[in-house]
Regions:
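Actuator/coupling domain of P-type ATPases
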Residues: 2-5, 26-27, 32-33, 39-125, ...
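Bilayer-spanning, highly hydrophobic alpha-helical transmembrane segments
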Residues: 15-20, 229-264, 281-298, 578-607
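Small-residue-enriched core segments of transmembrane alpha-helices in multipass membrane transport
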Residues: 43, 94, 236, 267-289, ...
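Conserved cytosolic headpiece of P-type ATPases
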Residues: 122, 133, 154-155, 161, ...
Length: 631
């Protein structure tokens, strides 16, 4: 332990001094109350704070806490002449508490380090030059300067400069993102290369990093079912065990006093034996292993997920996600890129594919329509605007233009009919762009939304994890939906749906399934469905306020494979929680029985309390470590 706090170092020194004094007393030939008086020094050195807290607890009516139980057990041991054991039990207890405090502190420090993404200062441009100010003091519309190596303090738009950004703290991905003038920039990223002047678009309290931190910090308020169970369990468990300990002492003691012939279980015992057993019972009764480790497991799971760019709004959602056996996807922007791209070119005889694409792209040179943008991006030849003239946009039809002196038409079937040109239909899914050159049909170009590179792998991973059903909902045509679903290996698809229809479909699926249903959407247009599903997952939440507000879980980037990562983290967290519950209850049950039978020494009872808690906390800390840490 090289990073102990001042309080922890003080406790360590008390433990060492008390242990040394106890060893000294053990070595001296002391007996009776002389030995008892000598043991008082190490006992009070190591246990004075426990005794003080126990007394305050009694005054305040907090009888059933661990300080009261430990004080009662050790004072009782002292009163029956078990001086060495009283000191040893308190020493063992405080040592366990030190390790426990260290483990909890380390885990919380690790989680805090994960979320240490909010800069403390911003470089504000003023009439007097650059001033270093608190981000909260920067008004919307102000210009800030972000130097290479600095973390972006506020959301804004790049006014001047270009650079690359490290978004790993937000998305979990190490690949830098390029940025230039006009691009949006969000707080929490690290500027890697160039100096940037940024116009602030949001106040500090509404910035992306503030919303993320608020979300993670508030996640502990939404407790999982397991956490709620432990809270209720502890409320009744401790008093029941205390009363059982009291009965374990009083009943045999009374029977010893009044029965002329003792039954077998009382034979050979005296009242102090039963007092010792009752005190052992008391030590075991504290449920701190569960009360501390279960919430810590969920908090660690949420912190570990945030390292991967997955924000979970509470332990209840993490626990629900672990039970998900149906995943429903929106299509556009979730499984597909949500942007048009040329997927096929079908030239007519006498024309080349590159020629058809080039003429179409040149004709669409001045258009801002998404289809025009996709044509220009697909054309590898230079876009020389001097080759284009007499551009005429025909609403609802397309564009007519002169390219290299040739009359070119680019548009839909209505444009072909307007020109009295015979055109060929296409059965491929997507938007069909027909092209004519000097009145002759040159061919058609298919423009379609493309599946994301990892979309198919995401479905494969989900099925490998035991997800029973993957479903796609879309407002697109049945042909397009069938093509995407078939390419990705989805189990079902439902097409041509309005937003209200999607809610209806999800409700139908909820009635069919026994497990939990997760819906994955873009978080902007899918708010009703995100709310209706057992778990609403918004994808692409980086910079999207609507996504962060609408969903239970937010994926900060656009990778569908993150869904499988989120489920793995959820299942691991719930598995660790169950391990801790089973381990703690099993050990306590065994030692309780041993204590009642007089087979458990007091130090074993302390282990069943503090030792089990320490081991459970160490196990809970595993929730912090994810697949990303193994790379």
């Amino acid at each position: 332990m090289t990073t102990l706090s001042k309080k922890q170092r003080k406790m360590r020194n008390r433990i060492l001094i008390a242990a040394a004094l106890l060893v000294l007393v053990k070595l001296l030939p002391l007996t009776g109350w002389v030995r008892g008086l000598c043991c008082l020094a190490p006992y009070f050195i190591i246990g004075y704070d426990v005794l003080r807290k126990a007394a305050l607890g009694i005054v305040n009516g907090q009888v059933f806490d661990e300080n009261f139980l430990m004080a009662l057990a050790t004072v009782g041991a002292y009163a029956t002449g078990e001086f060495d054991e009283a000191v040893f039990v308190m020493l063992f207890y405080q040592t366990g508490e030190l390790f426990q405090d260290y483990a909890v502190g380390k885990s919380r420090t690790s989680i805090a380090a994960l979320m240490d993404i909010r800069p403390d200062t911003a470089n504000l441009e003023t009439e007097n030059g650059l001033e270093t100010v608190d981000p909260e003091d920067v008004a919307v519309g102000s210009v800030i300067v972000v130097k290479p190596g600095e973390r972006v303090p506020l959301d804004g738009t790049v006014l001047e400069g270009s650079s690359t950004l490290d978004t790993a703290a937000l998305t979990g991905e190490a690949l830098p993102r390029s940025i230039r003038v006009g691009d949006d920039i969000i707080s929490g990223c690290v500027n890697l290369t160039g100096l940037l002047r940024v116009t602030v678009t949001k106040p500090c309290e509404e910035s992306t990093v503030s919303k993320i931190l608020e979300l993670v910090e508030n996640s502990s308020e939404k407790k999982a079912v397991s956490e709620q169970f432990i809270t209720r369990f502890a409320k009744y468990y401790t008093p029941c065990v205390v009363y059982a300990a009291l009965a374990l002492f009083l009943i045999p003691t009374v029977l010893l006093a009044v029965l002329p012939t003792l039954p077998g279980f009382l034979a050979g015992t005296v009242w102090t034996d039963w007092l010792h057993r009752a005190l052992t019972f008391l030590v075991i009764s504290c449920p701190c292993a569960l009360v501390i480790s279960v919430p810590l497991s969920f908090f660690g799971g949420i912190g570990g997920a945030s390292k991967c760019g997955i924000l979970v709004k509470g332990g209840n959602y993490l626990e629900a996600l672990a039970k998900a056996d149906t995943v429903v996807f929106d299509k556009t922007g979730t499984l597909t890129k949500g942007t048009f791209a040329v997927s096929a070119i079908h030239p007519e005889a006498g024309f080349e594919a590159d020629q058809v694409l080039e003429y179409a792209a040149l004709a669409e040179q001045y258009s801002t329509h998404p289809i025009a943008v996709s044509l220009r991006e697909a054309c590898k030849s230079g876009m020389d605007r001097s080759r284009v003239s007499n551009v005429e946009e025909i609403a609802g039809h397309g564009i007519m233009a002169e390219v290299d002196g040739k009359r070119v038409g680019v548009g839909n079937s209505r444009l072909m009919e307007r020109q009295s040109v015979n055109w060929l239909p296409c059965e491929l899914p997507g938007t069909i762009v027909h092209v004519t050159i000097d009145g002759f049909y040159a061919g058609h170009i298919v423009i379609a939304d493309q599946p994301k590179p990892d979309a198919k792998e995401a479905i494969v991973q989900l099925k490998a994890m035991g997800v029973k059903k993957t479903v796609m909902l879309t407002g697109d045509t049945k042909e397009v939906a069938h093509t995407v679903a078939d390419a990705l290996g989805l189990d079902e698809y439902h097409a041509e749906l309005l937003p209200a229809d999607k809610v209806t479909r999800v409700e139908e699926l909820l009635k069919q399934e026994t497990g939990k249903l997760a819906f994955v959407g873009d978080g902007i247009n899918d708010a009703p469905v995100l709310t209706r599903a057992d778990i609403g997952i918004a994808m692409g939440g980086l910079g999207s306020d609507a996504a962060i507000e609408a969903a239970d879980i937010v994926l900060m980037d656009d990778q569908p494979t993150k869904i499988a990562v989120a489920i793995r983290i959820a299942r691991k967290t719930v598995r660790i929680v169950r391990e801790n519950i089973v381990f703690a209850l099993t050990v306590k049950a065994i030692v309780l029985v041993m204590g009642a039978l007089g087979r458990a020494p007091m130090w074993l009872a302390v282990f069943a309390d503090v030792g089990v808690a320490f081991l459970a906390i160490l196990n809970a800390m595993r929730c912090l470590y994810t697949e990303k840490d193994k790379k």
